[in-house]
Amino acid sequence: MTKQISKSTQYKPSKSTLVSAKLFSMNRTESTRLLDRAWSVLESGSDGYVYAKDIPEIISFIDRELPSKLTTQSNDKVIESWVNNDPMKTLSKEQFLEAFSMLVGTSFDTAVQIAMQSDILTPTRRGASLFGSYRRSSNDLEQVLPAEQIKALKRELQEWKDKYTFLEHEFQFFLSQEKKNPEVIDNTKHEFIISELNRKLREQDEAIEDLKSQLDYGLVPELKDKTNWIKALQRKAYNYLLPKILICLLLLLLYYCLAAKILFTKSSSTDDVPSFIRQQSWWERNKILSRIQWYFKDRIENNVVRNSSEVIQNYNSVFGIH
């Protein structure tokens, strides 16, 4: 009787619990099998590694073997960004599992287990199960973690780009130096550093000029509008007032010229001006011409005086005047 009661009171797990336990037991074996199959297809040579650019193909290969996708759309974007950072990076299986856990936010085994479970359990049971709650919490974290991861990956990508640009410039510099002089130059390294610093300075100058242009044309529209208004006003004043100002100046000049001419004419026509004030003519100011003038003037005046005295004497003798 006691045995029957104990048997009747034994715990009997439900079907869903048995399914979950079965999934737990076969999860690691199944995920390993899927990864080995995908790895054997995409591995490079016999060294047992793949390139980072092969990760999306590995995930796609495993997705075809599962009832649902292994990753979400946001996971795919993060993986793509990480792959583009260094597509030729070599990865072993352990490194792949670490990268997958970092990028997706869950381990590879758990992701495979969740993808396999989605075809067996109903949505209600799946939502109430352990994996469903884990998937929901993982989805909640996906809204925060990928954004931070993307920022970190972008910063790392920019650093690698800067390093690549630096190495490319260094290579081009040494290549040009080798073409100029095949012999080894001791100060080549210093010359490259100086040229690189000059290039950085030029880039900074260009950035400053761009910022100035943005300040002039984009970031201070009020100042720009005010400056344009002042320039337009100056242009209108120049086109409208300048011709009138020139006409007024021309009229004033003509007025002063005519007034001066009239005054000069009046002063020259007056008769009450004494003779000693009048200005001598040009031939009177010449010494030679002035002497000739006075010579002939004296001779003429002497002849006139002598002739007049003879006429007076004859007149007196005729009329008996003594």
Swiss-Prot record:
Its membrane topology: Single-pass membrane protein
Coiled coil ranges: 147-217
Pfam families xref list: MPS2 (PF17060)
Membrane-spanning residues: 245-265
GO BP terms, alphabetized: protein localization to spindle pole body; spindle pole body duplication
Database matches in InterPro entries: Mps2
Gene Ontology cellular component terms for the protein in this record: cytoplasm; nuclear membrane; spindle pole body
The keyword Nucleus is assigned to this record: yes
Membrane as UniProt keyword: yes
Keywords: Coiled coil, Cytoplasm, Cytoskeleton, Membrane, Nucleus, Transmembrane, Transmembrane helix
Domain of life: Eukaryota
Location in the cell: Nucleus membrane; Cytoplasm, Cytoskeleton, Microtubule organizing center, Spindle pole body
Main subcellular location: nucleus
Function, in words: Component of the spindle pole body (SPB) required for insertion of the nascent SPB into the nuclear envelope and for the proper execution of spindle pole body (SPB) duplication.
Membership in a protein family: Belongs to the MPS2 family.
Protein name from the UniProt record: Monopolar spindle protein 2
Organism whose genome encodes this protein: Kluyveromyces lactis (strain ATCC 8585 / CBS 2359 / DSM 70799 / NBRC 1267 / NRRL Y-1140 / WM37) (Yeast)
Species classification: Eukaryota, Fungi, Dikarya, Ascomycota, Saccharomycotina
